[in-house]
Structures are given as structure tokens and as C-alpha cells.
Amino acid sequence: MLKPDYGSIKINSKDVSNFPIYKRTLKFKIGFVPQNGGFFQDLTVLENLKAISEITIANVAIREEKINSLISKFELDALLRIKANHLSGGQKKRLVIALSLISDPKVLLLDEPFAALDILTIKNLQKIIVELQSIQGISIILCDHQARDLLACVDTAVIINNGKVVANGTPSEIIDDIDAKRTYFGDSFKII
């Protein structure tokens, strides 16, 4: 999301490298889910949803409809009066994804979405990611060190090591790629 050290950032073939971050995210409908944070810690879940929706949605009726839809979709009903900093890791992740969807992004960037989550929460998050792609048509770009978790919810993956593309393909192609395996297991990796 920052200005690149070298190269360029292109969205729909337009170079946006020098655009301010807010312009890139709003004009090109990009949502962002950071690894940590992404919400107002001292506000309740409902207050977070209202605060972000007031910034991005002018019409009050549409705003309320959007909030109610996200509360239902991310099962936040029982959490509405709880301050965000008191939520579990999985609950925080659901809240941040809901907040990122308020502006109806076409592209959603997720940074380490599976970090520090339990297996059940990871499975639920994978389901959400697949639904966002297949049902809502949102393009998802995510980075994660847990290849197994990532490969379970994407149709294409790219493995990068030291700034260079090591492997690029479907999850099954990545799993079979020797260079991808060496990236994860080191040069001493041997096929038996």
C-alpha cells in the first residue's frame, strides 16, 4: 500500500504508484485487512462498524442496511456491545474483514490472515475468503507464511523468496513444484 522502492503499482493498467494511499484505496475500491489492528480498540464492535460506515456511506438507510448485513454475515450479533480490544483473535479478524467490506471493495488485501488463529477459526476464515471470491466476486490478494492454510482457499498462488517469484500456479501445481518445496524446506530438501 506504500510507494514502492522500485517498480510500479498498476490497477487496471493505470500506474497509481504516486497516488496517495487514500486515493488508491477509495478510487480503486481496495479493502485492506492488516495482520494486527485495523479497528478502534476502545470502541465496541457496533461503534466500529458505525464509525467506518459513516466515513464511506452517505445515505443513512444504506449505511444501516450494510451494517446489519455485515453483522449477520460475520456472526457479530453477540459481540456488538463488546469493546474491540476485548475480542479473541478470530473475533477481531472477523470484525476487521467486516470493516474492510463496508466500502464494497473490488479487491481485498489480507496480510497474514491466519496468524495466531486456532484451526477452527482458520477453517471458518478460509470459508469466508472463498465466499467473498466466488459469491461476491471480490479479488483477494493475501500473503501468509502458512502455505497450507493459504492454498486451501485460493485458485492461484505465487511463492516469493527474497523478492523473486519462485513458483506460480494453482495450489496443486505449487504443491508439486520442487522450487517451492526448496523455498520452504531449504536446499537440503530431497525427493524420496
At which residue positions do the language-model features occur?
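Conserved ABC ATPase signature
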Residues: 83-87
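Conserved catalytic motifs of ABC-family nucleotide-binding domains
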Residues: 104
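Catalytic Walker B motif of ABC-type/P-loop ATPase nucleotide-binding domains
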Residues: 108-112
